[in-house]
Amino acid sequence: MFHRIEEALEDLKQGKVVIVCDDENRENEGDFIALAEYITPETINFMITHGRGLVCVPITEGYAERLQLEPMVSHNTDSHHTAFTVSIDHVSTTTGISAHERATTIQQLLNPASKGADFNRPGHIFPLIAKEGGVLRRAGHTEAAVDLAQLCGAEPAGVICEIINEDGAMARVPDLLQCAKQFDIKMITIEDLIAYRRHHETLVTREVEITLPTDFGTFQAIGYSNSLDTKEHIALVKGDISTGEPVLVRVHSECLTGDVFGSCRCDCGPQLHAALAQIEREGKGVLLYMRQEGRGIGLLNKLRAYKLQEEGFDTVEANEKLGFPADLRDYGIGAQILKDLGLQHLRLLTNNPRKIAGLQGYDLTVTERVPLQMPAKEENKTYLQTKVNKLGHLLNL
């Protein structure tokens, strides 16, 4: 149904337009996107004729600063925090509204010799400032356009236009597919662009390594940062893991209440201790401790989910009532840390098939699933049963 990111990049490099769709839980829309560096009046005319939306120009913060493009409003109340600057026309244009003059404004916006004084305000081109980090920070069309331009080796700026049906309603995926077929346009998703970047870019940095004696044995503790957020992760390494043989690995998501306070609501603490003990017995392995509290929703939201569970919701329903997916974790950063440690083949300590699929999606091979089941307690029987029934965990209860 959708094309590969590589196919879209090839078309963009040729000056063609692509369609980019975002998540159905976000704006749930598709935009025409082209590279600003290759924009022509013909492309602008195509967008306004068949897209019918607002023509905008996603740019980096650097462009906005150089051209003194101030935010359109001082207090942004847009639900998606779209970062409009003041609209502009190049001083050489007349009304600025024609396809030719809009293309001229965009071309001059990219001209390194242009200054802020070269543009009238307001105008008919609407620059948007992309967040640094692109779609890995904000999954919007603004960031997608700049990311695609950078992946093409072009100036980091794009031209976008929302696609609206002839009846005035927003075009959804079936409409967008028909549009792509009619005009022979490649169609991709922001979700796939995120996956592409995570797969092809190094996002983790090894910061520090120490010897860590524990109650379970002595490990090498290696601390990692990443370029996506402020979260810091740690790998506890035992023995020589560089032999090329499958290595026993536990990817453990942080659970303050279970790991530190011994909460009986979950089985996280016992799993953590059992994994360390098993790695110590084998004399070789890795425990990767990921700062993904509450399956990725954070500590306070996890406590809010617990409150809902006290009212009768299960762990999945509680997450969803708070507006989160059942499991918000992403395994891309963890996979990059494991690769940095030199691992390729894993014997994975887990009861969660999705964790296996998540790691294998980043070119790691799970040669064996090693069960890590803890005895159920009265306080967590319902929780564990929900993990089996709704999250597909492999447990014998």
From Swiss-Prot:
It comes from the Bacteria. Residues 200-397 are annotated as: GTP cyclohydrolase II. Signal peptide: none annotated. It catalyses: D-ribulose 5-phosphate = (2S)-2-hydroxy-3-oxobutyl phosphate + formate + H(+); GTP + 4 H2O = 2,5-diamino-6-hydroxy-4-(5-phosphoribosylamino)-pyrimidine + formate + 2 phosphate + 3 H(+). InterPro entries: DHBP_synth_RibB-like_a/b_dom, DHBP_synthase_RibB, GTP_cyclohydro_II, RibA, RibA-like_sf, Riboflavin_synth_RibBA. The active site is at 327 (proton acceptor), 329 (nucleophile). GTP binds at residues 250-254, 271, 293-295, 315, 350, 355. Residues 1-199 are annotated as: DHBP synthase. Mg(2+) 2 binds at residues 27, 141. Binds 2 divalent metal cations per subunit. Magnesium or manganese. One of its GO terms (biological process) is riboflavin biosynthetic process. Keywords: GTP-binding, Hydrolase, Lyase, Magnesium, Manganese, Metal-binding, Multifunctional enzyme, Nucleotide-binding, Riboflavin biosynthesis, Zinc. D-ribulose 5-phosphate binds at residues 26-27, 31, 138-142, 162. Its EC number is 4.1.99.12, 3.5.4.25. Pathway: Cofactor biosynthesis; riboflavin biosynthesis; 2-hydroxy-3-oxobutyl phosphate from D-ribulose 5-phosphate: step 1/1; Cofactor biosynthesis; riboflavin biosynthesis; 5-amino-6-(D-ribitylamino)uracil from GTP: step 1/4. The record marks 124, 162 as: Essential for DHBP synthase activity. GO terms for cellular component: cytosol. Its cofactor is Mg(2+); Mn(2+); Zn(2+). Zn(2+) binds at residues 255, 266, 268. In the N-terminal section; belongs to the DHBP synthase family. In the C-terminal section; belongs to the GTP cyclohydrolase II family. Catalyzes the conversion of D-ribulose 5-phosphate to formate and 3,4-dihydroxy-2-butanone 4-phosphate. Catalyzes the conversion of GTP to 2,5-diamino-6-ribosylamino-4(3H)-pyrimidinone 5'-phosphate (DARP), formate and pyrophosphate. PANTHER family: 3,4-DIHYDROXY-2-BUTANONE 4-PHOSPHATE SYNTHASE (PTHR21327:SF18), GTP CYCLOHYDROLASE II-RELATED (PTHR21327). This is Riboflavin biosynthesis protein RibBA.
